[in-house]
Amino acid sequence: MEGKKEEIREHYNSIRERGRESRQRSKTINIRNANNFIKACLIRLYTKRGDSVLDLGCGKGGDLLKYERAGIGEYYGVDIAEVSINDARVRARNMKRRFKVFFRAQDSYGRHMDLGKEFDVISSQFSFHYAFSTSESLDIAQRNIARHLRPGGYFIMTVPSRDVILERYKQGRMSNDFYKIELEKMEDVPMESVREYRFTLLDSVNNCIEYFVDFTRMVDGFKRLGLSLVERKGFIDFYEDEGRRNPELSKKMGLGCLTREESEVVGIYEVVVFRKLVPESDA
């Protein structure tokens, strides 16, 4: 398993930072814009002015500007890829911001982590599925989150939907011009037991190992740690609902109608939010 984790780390270390001009020319620009709009709305919904935020799997710091616009007071970014953390530091230095920033290169999903403080919001965008590599890894990741989330605080995430992927597998729709999913399945193994797959996304991810999210197990694990599920919604529904509620932001971010193939990529994912319960004595 360590070999696979190293492969994932090296994959993200190898991805070069692309300038805004290059991103705008990408064939996946509409997909990127849709994903960024969804993340911006998710941050708006669950982040208050002055909040402290722990961003797990922060990558190159692509959400820093979203948090600046949300008016947070402190940001702590953690990622397994050292190169990504260095790029995030550069991005933070070069932007106008009013909040404090800290970064740390660490595996927060498979290694015990204690930053010595709690946060109002913990975010995991397109990365928490890596916690499902083993049962032990998931347990460690969930304990890391519970340890660092303030009572009443929110854990917000975007993850691939196992249900969507398996439904497409049954229908034989596992790729288009933008993406490709390859299941690592042996003949005698039932689909319910398959834990991982290979994912490729044009201009972004190249045949990287990803893990299925066991939703029931995740909810049960967080429940034992005092976190309850407050929202679960597929990306397409979330995108359409928030587009109606935030027409100005939608226009500002250059959103348009997604093609069928673009929608297929966006529709792989879902929004999931947990809230840490407040002890009755503190309520």
From Swiss-Prot:
Effect listed in the UniProt record for changing D79 to A/N: Loss of activity
Outcome of substituting F126H: Reduces activity by 92%
Phenotype for Y130L: Reduces activity by 99%
Result, substituting Y130F: Reduces activity by 66%
Catalytic function, reaction form: a 5'-end (5'-triphosphoguanosine)-ribonucleoside in mRNA + S-adenosyl-L-methionine = a 5'-end (N(7)-methyl 5'-triphosphoguanosine)-ribonucleoside in mRNA + S-adenosyl-L-homocysteine
Described function: mRNA-capping methyltransferase that methylates the N7 position of the added guanosine to the 5'-cap structure of mRNAs. Binds RNA containing 5'-terminal GpppC.
Phenotype for K60A: Reduces activity by 92%. Loss of activity
Consequence when changing R32A: No effect. Loss of activity
PANTHER family referenced in this protein's UniProt entry, alphabetically: MRNA CAP GUANINE-N7 METHYLTRANSFERASE (PTHR12189:SF2), MRNA GUANINE-7- METHYLTRANSFERASE (PTHR12189)
Matching Pfam families: mRNA_G-N7_MeTrfase
Cellular component terms per the entry's GO annotation: nucleus
UniProt cross-references to PROSITE patterns, sorted A to Z: RNA_CAP0_MT
Keyword S-adenosyl-L-methionine in annotation: yes
Keyword set, alphabetical order: Methyltransferase, mRNA capping, mRNA processing, Nucleus, RNA-binding, S-adenosyl-L-methionine, Transferase
Location of the mRNA cap 0 methyltransferase domain: 26-277
GO molecular function ontology, one term from the record: mRNA 5'-cap (guanine-N7-)-methyltransferase activity
Enzyme class: transferase
Residues under site feature: mRNA cap binding: K60, K66, R91, H129, E210, Y269
Protein name (record): mRNA cap guanine-N(7) methyltransferase
Organism per entry: Encephalitozoon cuniculi (strain GB-M1) (Microsporidian parasite)
Major subcellular location class: nucleus
EC numbers on record: 2.1.1.56
Record's subcellular location: Nucleus
Outcome recorded upon mutating D63 to A/N: Reduces activity by 99%
